[in-house]
Structure formats: structure tokens, C-alpha cells
Amino acid sequence: MSQYCIRIILVLATGFAVLVQPGVLSAQELDRYQVIVECTDTINRYAHTRDQLDSEGHASLFTEDGVMEFGGSITGREAIAQRLRDNDGSAMTRHMSGSIVVSIDDNDGITAHSYFHVFQANRPDSPGPLPAESYLMVEYDDELRMTDTGCKFAKREFKIIFMGQH
């Protein structure tokens, strides 16, 4: 394959692409982009699995000894899955992620900071748009690890920044 045909496009969650041509980025720099993309994907999948009440998928985003902190701590995949299973399903949520910043330090430690806008409403008896009954702006601080199965949360801490009612 010719040098002109070899191009790698990394699409980041922010919606822009980085075009990489041979010789432009080192393998190490390309690895950094791959880590950023994989960790951004993990952060976005957190929202989807949480909103769909997919407890196993949600827990799989964490390391075996992963920790969630939000006033208290939940440690381990099984405890994280159980927290979501304990949800009675009466409230519907949608987590909108944004402003995701993934950082890799000199020792390959991975951290991320992101915001989530969370809407909540009671589950409907019939289909159709729902009026949001409450909304939150949440800030997440993450410690992540690359594993054989991708980027995983080692620790996810969140705090509520804004809270409102409609």
C-alpha cells in the first residue's frame, strides 16, 4: 500500500478528527491518542449503560477493584452492578456527557475530568416525550487504567454542581 493511502483518522468525542500521516506522529504519540479515544469511549459508555439500567455492562467499565465515590464508596464490580440492579426502574434518566478532558502523565497514569447534564423523569405508562422533573449538572473526576479489554475506571468520583426542578 502506498504511503499516500495510509492514513489513520481518530475521531474524538468532541466531534473533530485528527488526521495522521506516516512520519507525522511517533508510535508513542499515536498510542497516546488511542488511549484518549478509548478512555473517552468508556466515559460515554458509562452514560449509556447507566441510562439503560445495564448493570453488567455498567460494572464492566470498572476494574475488578474499581471504586465509585459520591458521598460514600462502592468498591468492586459486583457491588457496582448491585447498585444499579437495586434501582427500581421508576425513574428514567439520560446522562449527557461533555467537556471530557483525558490526561496522561509521564508515568502513564490516566485521569479524566468531565461534566454530565442529567435529566430525570418518571417512567411513562405510554410512549411520548416526557417533561423532565429534575436535572443535575454533575462533575466527574476519574482515574483510569488500560487493561487487556480496554480502558477501565479504577476510581470514579462525582459531585453535584447544580440541581434544579421543573
Locate each region found by the language model.
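N-terminal secretory signal peptides that target proteins for export/translocation
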Residues: 1-5
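A solvent-exposed, acidic/Ser-Thr-rich amphipathic alpha-helical stretch
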Residues: 55-120
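Short beta-strand edge/turn micro-motifs at domain boundaries
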Residues: 23, 109-111, 135-166
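Bacterial N-terminal signal peptides
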Residues: 8-21
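Transmembrane beta-barrel outer-membrane domains
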Residues: 37, 91-93, 133-135
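Short beta-strand segments enriched in hydrophobic/aromatic residues
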Residues: 50, 62, 116-118, 157-160
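Short, surface-exposed loop/helix-turn segments at secondary-structure junctions
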Residues: 124-134
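Short, low-complexity N-terminal intrinsically disordered segments enriched in polar/charged residues
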Residues: 23-48, 52, 60-64
